[in-house]
């Protein structure tokens, strides 16, 4: 349930910066090969760090 709250907070931030989306989309388009081994390794590393963060966050709130 706390994951949904985190996603809601992120969506709230996106709404405030949504005014300049038309200009930013042109600059932020990237062609990322999702099947590349280095992309998969990066995704695993990011997910691992996120899980550690969530575990630490859950432990400190109790």
Swiss-Prot record:
Residues 12-28 have a biased composition (Basic and acidic residues). GO terms for cellular component: cytoplasm; cytosol; nucleus; protein-containing complex. Changing residue 31 to A: Decreased calmodulin modulator function. GO terms for biological process: positive regulation of CAMKK-AMPK signaling cascade; positive regulation of neuron differentiation. Changing residue 29 to A: No effect on the calmodulin modulator function. The keyword Hydrolase does not apply. Changing residue 35 to A: No effect on the calmodulin modulator function. Keywords: Calmodulin-binding. Changing residue 40 to A: Decreased calmodulin modulator function. One of its GO terms (molecular function) is calmodulin binding. Residues 1-39 are annotated as: Disordered. The keyword Cell cycle does not apply. Residues 39-62 form the IQ domain. Changing residue 37 to G: Loss of the calmodulin modulator function. Residues 28-40 are annotated as: Acidic. PANTHER family: CALMODULIN REGULATOR PROTEIN PCP4, IG-LIKE DOMAIN-CONTAINING PROTEIN. Binds to both calcium-free and calcium-bound calmodulin. The affinity for the calcium-bound form is 50-fold greater. Functions as a modulator of calcium-binding by calmodulin. Thereby, regulates calmodulin activity and the different processes it controls. For instance, may play a role in neuronal differentiation through activation of calmodulin-dependent kinase signaling pathways. Belongs to the PCP4 family. Mostly intrinsically disordered, with residual structure localized to the IQ domain which mediates the interaction with calmodulin. This is Calmodulin regulator protein PCP4. The lineage of its organism: Eukaryota, Metazoa, Chordata, Craniata, Vertebrata.
